[in-house]
Design a protein with these regions (language model features):
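Bacterial N-terminal signal peptides
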Residues: 12-22
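Low-complexity intrinsically disordered segments
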Residues: 1-2, 18
Length: 307
């Protein structure tokens, strides 16, 4: 085989479509749509450079979404779980309803760490896209400045038909969200500046319930993050002092959505006419992603520990 023919064969292999082993019993069915996350990560050890990857997290199954396996209990799992991920994927990378790039990534033979399960190595010479500058806002449990994670999909389904955008809650909606927060945390304990190690009951006020972020859609749905200010205790905060998210229906019904997370992006990733929302899990010794769909009535969770 000539060198030119070899190069052509390599090019065909490199840009091949998704290599994906379907679960038993579904061979011959339509290939699922996959959602991954283009990540920026600090090196595993001091002095190691940052690295980029695409973490394979969700796939369509029937009329819903399911997560890929993620939470390995032991080292043996790390050596075998890679077989449950697609061998190679061509990704369309998106942000805010627009395509921002394309990458190709491959699953390694095994994963070395619990926190790297699902991470594929980016191949090729094209630099993966970035949005903005590195920030600790995206660093999660490790707390180092990294580039914003971006949603990657195997189909060009990146548009956001519901047009989710930052917003300000009305006075009435803010009051309803605060009522829901207080219903979730009727009793809170706190420390004092004079004693940061011992807690006692703390009658927090409305002003302590800060609406930190809020987003709205053209279908008149809202989501809001509430953070309780005024915590004085030393060490990891109690649940009430962590990020709490609520969803508000067009009828102004408020429901708890989740905690210790932040919104990565929204898009109609399965092309059903409605947007899915992807959140990043940001908790102590815990990371991953949550995908909400069907008007927040259903979700899929990809979750891992760091040690």
């Amino acid at each position: 085989m000539t060198e030119i023919m070899k190069e052509r064969h390599l090019a065909v292999a490199f840009f091949a479509a998704i290599v994906f082993t379907l679960p038993p019993g579904v061979a011959g069915q339509v290939q699922p749509t996959l959602v991954g996350i283009l990540e920026d990560n600090p090196g595993h050890y001091a002095g190691n450079p940052h690295y980029r990857d695409v973490r394979v997290v969700f796939r369509t199954e029937g009329a819903g979404w399911v997560a890929f396996p993620s939470n390995c209990p032991d080292q043996g799992c790390l050596k075998t779980i890679a077989a449950k991920f697609p061998a190679q994927v061509n990704w369309t990378v998106a942000f805010d309803g627009k395509q921002v790039g394309q990458v190709v990534s491959r699953t390694p033979p095994s994963f070395d760490f619990y926190a790297t399960v699902g991470q594929q190595t980016i191949v090729g010479s094209v630099a993966p896209p970035t949005i903005g500058k590195p920030s600790t806002d995206f660093g999660g449990f490790l707390g180092e400045p990294v580039y914003r994670p971006l949603v990657a999909i195997t189909e060009p389904n990146y548009r956001d038909p519901e047009d989710w955008k930052p917003t300000q809650l009305s006075t009435a909606t803010t009051a309803a969200v605060r009522k829901a927060f207080r219903s979730r945390f009727p009793k809170v304990t706190n420390c004092s500046q004079q004693d940061i190690e011992h807690t006692k009951p703390w009658p927090y006020t409305d002003s302590n319930m800060v609406v930190n972020k809020a987003y709205s859609s053209t279908r008149h749905w809202l989501i809001a993050e509430v953070i309780l200010s005024g915590g004085e205790c030393d060490g990891p905060p109690d649940e009430a002092f962590t990020s709490q998210w609520f969803v508000i229906t067009p009828e102004q019904q408020v429901r708890f959505l989740g905690s210790n997370m932040w919104l990565v992006d929204a898009g109609d990733y399965d092309n059903d006419g409605k947007s899915e929302l992807v959140f990043s899990i940001d908790d102590y010794n815990r990371g991953g992603y949550k995908l909400f769909y069907d008007d927040f009535s259903r979700s899929a969770i990809f979750e891992f520990g760091y040690h």
